[in-house]
């Protein structure tokens, strides 16, 4: 309702009441105006009524919601199901145009505005999380792996001779397949063991750059967030190598936005060397459904090139999800979640440490990994290979999700490449182990329930192992008794034969 509508309403209802309602509406509109003017995440989260008003105002700016609209094209925002239309708040046209995912659509001003605001809010949050000098970013409706592929395909046009991507090993399939899908040959750099941690082999990286030649290398593809005992790559040193040899640097920052340490590494890498783009998942960092990522970087023109590489229009669902989430939380709400995650990491670490010691195991010392933890499973692995994988199955059937058990010597072929010791990020890690992570949104009750169920599973596996050991002992003892009886029979037979003769 506008001013004229309220004035007309005063003829039907007491003007004092109408003016009060008008003031209430203005308070909602004031929040919306501040958002459009500043393009930053509000400090305090919005209530649902403000959010729904804002989304409704945007949606009616799209041509499919015009009163009396007549569409005669092949794509006019028609939706057969009213439920589907409501699910998307009647944003049907998606984002971008055929030549650029960030471009404005003439017949979808509301969706275009939604896209611009979302990208602006996400940029603000990335700065808040620790990468203060980021220049540009955009939300893309693909998960991390395909978003990395889009970055590699953009670099292809800038480096036509390149055929290799140097990749410090991380045993995660999608980031590996992102390079294969883009048509490049991954050059796997094995990690080095320093204490319990697996760290970047910088000498091997530089040696491979010199061996292959900088012109033949598309980029170095590094990683921040990862499963312990692997830790984030030495981003500063890798960024310096990239700057010295004029090689692009793409960072897989999948769930690193929630970690101040990961974001600091990216900021420092860009300060001392070269980082062209870093990619992060929406669902892992902002607690929204799977299917979106953020591509960000320090060179505005390069990020625009990546957005123009995306073919066709794109789904607005990931952008809408993260926009609603950030406006609901506000920057203070998101900062609170980051703080709670750090606290849960310390709590989870302490609880796993106590439990591991009770079973003669230990928490691996991985101080450079700010999200993931690992506990040894030596006592299980020494006795029976299947005991380690059995523990993982038991946890899963007891509704513990996210925990990973990593046995020794696992082999895995991914896109024609065979990895020894797959899941452990190295060919021969010294022991089997169990992973758990403290990610954004974790609560204390999650940790307590996990520790309780892990304790029960470890007891059950040990009890079964002990029973098998007893059974094996009994079988061995029976065989020994039979052999002794047979020998005694032979002695008695010989004695009888001697007496007879």
Curated annotation (Swiss-Prot):
Source species, domain of life: Eukaryota
Effect on the protein of changing residue 284 to A: Loss of activity
Region described as Tetramerization: spans on this chain: 1-44
Chief location bin: cytoplasm
GO biological process: conversion of seryl-tRNAsec to selenocys-tRNAsec; selenocysteine incorporation
Keywords assigned: Cytoplasm, Disease variant, Epilepsy, Intellectual disability, Neurodegeneration, Phosphoprotein, Protein biosynthesis, Pyridoxal phosphate, RNA-binding, Selenium, Transferase, tRNA-binding
Pfam families to which the protein is assigned, alphabetical: SepSecS
Pathway participation: Aminoacyl-tRNA biosynthesis; selenocysteinyl-tRNA(Sec) biosynthesis; selenocysteinyl-tRNA(Sec) from L-seryl-tRNA(Sec) (archaeal/eukaryal route): step 2/2
Outcome reported for the amino acid change (mutating residue 97 to Q): Indistinguishable from wild-type
Enzyme Commission number(s): 2.9.1.2
Catalyzed reaction equations: O-phospho-L-seryl-tRNA(Sec) + selenophosphate + H2O = L-selenocysteinyl-tRNA(Sec) + 2 phosphate
Keyword Transferase part of the UniProt annotation: yes
Coiled coil location: none
Modified residues (N6-(pyridoxal phosphate)lysine): 284
Leading EC class: transferase
Residues noted as binding tRNA in the record, renumbered to the chain: 271, 398, 463
Modified residues (Phosphoserine): 14
UniProt-recorded Gene Ontology molecular function terms: O-phosphoseryl-tRNA(Sec) selenium transferase activity; tRNA binding
Binding positions (pyridoxal 5'-phosphate): 75
Task of the protein: Converts O-phosphoseryl-tRNA(Sec) to selenocysteinyl-tRNA(Sec) required for selenoprotein biosynthesis.
PANTHER family in the cross-refs: O-PHOSPHOSERYL-TRNA(SEC) SELENIUM TRANSFERASE (PTHR12944:SF2), SOLUBLE LIVER ANTIGEN/LIVER PANCREAS ANTIGEN (PTHR12944)
The protein, known as: O-phosphoseryl-tRNA(Sec) selenium transferase
Species assigned in the record: Homo sapiens (Human)
């Amino acid at each position: 309702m506008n001013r004229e509508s309220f004035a007309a309403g005063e003829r039907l209802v007491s003007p004092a009441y109408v003016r009060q309602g008008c003031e209430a509406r203005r308070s909602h509109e004031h929040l919306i105006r501040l958002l459009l003017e500043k393009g930053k995440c509000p400090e305090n989260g919005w209530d649902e009524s403000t959010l729904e008003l804002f989304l409704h105002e945007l949606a009616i700016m799209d041509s499919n919601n015009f009163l009396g609209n007549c569409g005669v094209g092949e794509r006019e925002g028609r939706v057969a199901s009213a439920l589907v239309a409501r699910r998307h708040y009647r944003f049907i046209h998606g984002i971008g145009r055929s030549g650029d995912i960030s471009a404005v659509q003439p017949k979808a001003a509301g969706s275009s505005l939604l896209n611009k605001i979302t990208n602006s809010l996400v940029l603000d949050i990335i700065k808040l999380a620790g990468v203060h000098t980021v220049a540009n970013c955009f939300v893309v409706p693909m998960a991390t792996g395909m978003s990395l592929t889009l970055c590699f395909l953009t670099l292809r046009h800038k480096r036509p001779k390149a055929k290799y991507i140097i990749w410090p090993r991380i045993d995660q399939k999608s980031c590996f397949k992102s390079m294969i899908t883009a048509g490049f040959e991954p050059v796997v750099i094995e990690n080095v063991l320093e204490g319990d941690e697996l760290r970047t082999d910088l000498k091997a990286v530089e040696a491979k750059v010199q061996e292959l030649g900088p012109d033949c290398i598309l980029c170095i593809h590094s990683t921040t967030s990862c499963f312990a005992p692997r830790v984030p790559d030495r981003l500063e040193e890798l960024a310096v190598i990239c700057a010295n040899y004029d090689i692009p640097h793409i960072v897989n920052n999948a769930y690193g936005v929630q970690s101040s340490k990961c974001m600091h590494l990216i900021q420092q890498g860009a300060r001392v060397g070269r980082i062209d783009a870093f990619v992060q998942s929406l669902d892992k960092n902002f607690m929204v459904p799977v299917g979106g990522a953020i591509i960000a970087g320090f060179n505005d023109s390069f990020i625009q090139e990546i957005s123009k590489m995306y073919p066709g229009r794109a789904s607005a669902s990931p952008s809408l999800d993260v926009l609603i989430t950030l406006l609901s939380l506000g920057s203070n709400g998101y900062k609170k979640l980051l703080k709670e995650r750090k606290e849960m990491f310390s709590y989870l670490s302490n609880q796993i440490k106590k439990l591991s010691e009770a079973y003669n195991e230990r928490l691996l010392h991985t101080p450079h990994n700010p999200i993931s933890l690992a506990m040894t499973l030596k006592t299980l692995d020494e006795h029976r290979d299947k005991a380690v994988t059995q523990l993982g199955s038991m946890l899963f059937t007891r509704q513990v999700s996210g925990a990973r058990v990593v046995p020794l010597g696992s082999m895995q072929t991914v896109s024609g490449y065979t990895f020894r010791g797959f899941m452990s990020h190295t060919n021969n890690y010294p022991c089997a182990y169990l992973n758990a992570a403290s990610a954004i949104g974790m609560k204390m009750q999650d940790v307590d329930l996990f520790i309780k169920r892990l304790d029960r599973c470890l007891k059950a596996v040990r009890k079964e192992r002990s029973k098998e050991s007893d059974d094996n002992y009994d079988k061995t003892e029976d065989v020994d008794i039979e052999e002794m009886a047979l020998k005694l029979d032979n002695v008695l037979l010989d004695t009888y034969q001697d007496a007879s003769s």
